[in-house]
Amino acid sequence: MSGGQRLEGKTVVLAVTGSIAVVETVRLAHELRRRGAVVQAVMSAAACGIVHPDALTYATGREAITRCTGMVEHVLYCGEGGCADLLLVAPCTANTIGKIAHGIDDTPVTTFATTALGRGMPVVVVPAMHESMYRHPGVVENLAKLESWGIDVVPPRIEEEKAKIAGIEEIALHVERALLGRPLAGKRVVITSGACAEPVDDVRVLTTRSTGQMGRALALEAYRLGASVTVVHAGHVPCVENVHVETAGEMMEAVLAGVGKGADYYLSAAAVSDFAPARAAGKIPSGAPVEIALRPLPKVLDAVLRIFSGTVVAFKLGWDEEARAAAMLDAGVAMVVVNTPPAMGAAGGEFVLMRKDSRRTVTGTKEEVAEAIWSALL
């Protein structure tokens, strides 16, 4: 199980209810299968009125269940000893949320839910409805009740007065998190990612080619494993807290605040600026040579090591960095990940994971390398 196949060997029951968002479930089924899962669709009558069962039969490669028969499908999948590993109710209407919360099972979906909850198997609910329905006190109370039972409720996107179904990637990440054992449950992780940009003038910046792919992969892997994750960067990663910064100074401030709030891990995957120019007002005229003086900037990693007692992972970029990496290990870094410049912006590459007592070379995609890093830390 590695890279994109995090759900290999897992069976997910995709229970579909009568929200217009049911049109997204074909894509969702494909994504879960791409990640390795066996997917079995179960549909309410209302869902069948929006999307034909044949569409989900095609998307899953298994005949969609539209009614519970004498074969007791709900027990075969979600009962004691059943073959399913997780029940995913997506989309989930206000009506179905209320029925699950009160033990009512008068549709195939709610019957599967009652059975799954009685067995104690993981359940993920993905609400989708108009915003006014989502704000109804009874719906709010019912969702809180589901969460108190251990059900994972995936927050909707509030747009255009609608509580729209969460993105496909976000739903898949919640499924992975529910099925991977959560070895990082209760842990707080702070990760820096991507490039900083130091203003040269009001138009131009000094930056690097870093894309943030490694930081993103590390953050998503930590989330899958159950951690509470904060990413300090200029981009966006789903399912985590995103703290947006531009300059190295802003990153320094955000990181020190983050690790000071009880963090357990700090992973320094950003290409933090080493130098910054004095910012010129307006726009420097073009057409003539320009000399730009650069001043060195304080190191974020050094500042973290002075105040943070948790686990620190650093990254070193270069062709001959292992001697410097050894010095970083002596300074208190738990692991140094060494990679070469060609890996910057690429989908993968060769990385060396260095610890005081071990050295391991990992070659693969950045998602696979992130998995290897967290596996080594745990």
List the model feature ranges, each with a label.
Residues 1-378:
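A cross-family phosphate/adenosyl-ligand binding-site feature
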